A protein has these predicted regions:
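Rossmann-like adenosine-cofactor binding region
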Residues: 194-285
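Short helix-loop-beta connector
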Residues: 140-146, 168, 230-231
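NAD(P)-binding Rossmann-fold cofactor-contacting core
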Residues: 166-190
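Glycine-rich Rossmann-fold phosphate-binding loop(s) that bind the pyrophosphate
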Residues: 151-153
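N-terminal Rossmann-fold NAD(P) dinucleotide-binding loop
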Residues: 156-157
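Residues at the starts of beta-strands that form the adenosine-phosphate
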Residues: 146, 170-171, 196, 253
Length: 363
């Protein structure tokens, strides 16, 4: 039978600590040559919505150790509104019932069957933050106690969980442009983690004196400036442009979860003039590619760092930077397999016939 799991099931089955451990193992597999990642692919078309475009995304990866291959797909309607003076990338819940469409398909490389279909919402935010946690665990100072968090959305919340899972944080200072939102975020995360979470009036105030600086926003531009960065800080971002050029220049070394050149992604779009100026992943990746070329002498892969092929932090005064990048298929494969195994053991989820997803005729 093929198991169908939703976001609520994933939240019930997956802790941040276990997510981080699963991702660590996956990145070690990658470094040992027993994992495979296909480039992320984004395809764009116009839609009937005048201020939005259609986007279809796929990411794939497999792990020989677990005997699985995962594919994550998203069918999205994307807009770029100006919010609080900043251009944001916002997905619209345009599916029937005001819902989003994002799915993870997990296949067995032994029996070939489709093991599970998982909605990707909660697993997505966990694997992004979990990778952030892996980087902080191995690169941030051991005595890190204070974190600055720029962002107060769904991805920022799990970033807080991840940092608290790998360092005994006592305080998180959070900034986002909307005062009510950052206050509500601080109250919620403080209750969840049992630590002090303080809303900051501006990003500079949040960063001042922090041991870890994490960016987790949907801004299309830089939100942290190098002038605010102090010796000993560990910086971590989801997209490379969240930290400005000076942050990268000041960093003693940079850890990246995946390739920062053009091998990590591909974009496709129709020739419709309405798509001429949209912000594709290629446009966002231009920043990452440029910084890779400029700073490649001090960039190492997370997989190499975990295997001891490159040194970790050697000095408490070093400034380190973790570039999360655009995601890898092995992240979905490792975490989805963990969730699937636990769901099977607990009898959670809905089963449907596996035969619905196979055929007797030659494909």
């Amino acid at each position: 039978m093929t198991l169908v799991l939703n976001d609520e099931h994933v939240a019930q089955l997956l802790s941040m600590k276990d997510c981080i451990a699963a991702l660590e193992d996956a990145f070690r597999d990658m470094g040992q040559g027993t994992a495979v990642n296909a480039p992320r692919r984004d395809s764009f078309m116009v839609s009937s919505h005048p201020d939005a475009h259609y986007s279809f995304k796929t990411i794939e990866g497999g792990l020989e150790r677990l005997g699985v291959m995962a594919q994550r797909i998203n069918s999205d309607l994307v807009t770029y509104p100006m919010i609080d003076g900043v251009t944001r990338r916002v997905k619209v819940p345009a599916a029937p019932g005001n819902r989003y469409v994002g799915l993870i398909f997990l296949y067995s490389s032994e029996t070939l069957e489709l093991l599970t279909i998982i909605t990707d919402g909660h697993l997505q935010r966990m694997r992004v933050a979990g990778t952030t946690g892996v980087g902080a665990k191995h690169v941030a100072r051991e005595d890190a106690r204070t974190a600055a968090l720029l962002g107060s959305g769904w991805q920022a919340e799990t970033a807080a969980w991840a940092l608290a899972a790998v360092r005994p944080l006592s305080t998180i200072r959070v900034f986002s442009p909307n005062p009510e939102r950052r206050q509500a975020f601080a109250t919620k995360v403080a209750a969840t983690l049992g630590i002090e979470v303080v809303p900051a009036a501006d990003p500079k105030e949040a960063i001042r004196g922090a041991d870890i600086v994490a960016c987790a926003s949907n801004s299309s531009g830089s939100i942290a400036q190098g002038a605010w960065i102090e010796p000993g800080m560990h910086l971590t971002c989801i997209l490379p442009n969240e930290f400005d050029e000076e942050c990268w220049r000041k960093s003693d070394f940079v850890v990246s979860s995946g390739p920062m050149d053009e091998t990590g992604f591909a974009d496709y779009k129709t020739g419709n003039p309405r798509l001429a100026d949209i912000e594709t992943m290629t446009g966002q990746h231009d920043v990452e590619r440029e910084r890779f070329q400029r700073y490649k002498a001090k960039i190492c892969m997370l997989s190499d760092l975990l295997l001891g092929k490159t040194p970790k932090r050697t000095d408490a005064s070093q400034i380190t930077l973790m570039n999360k990048g655009f995601g890898l298929g092995i992240e979905f494969a490792s975490v989805a397999k963990l969730v699937y195994d636990r769901a099977c053991a607990a009898g959670i989820g809905e089963e449907i016939p596996t035969e619905w997803f196979s055929q007797t005729s030659h494909p």
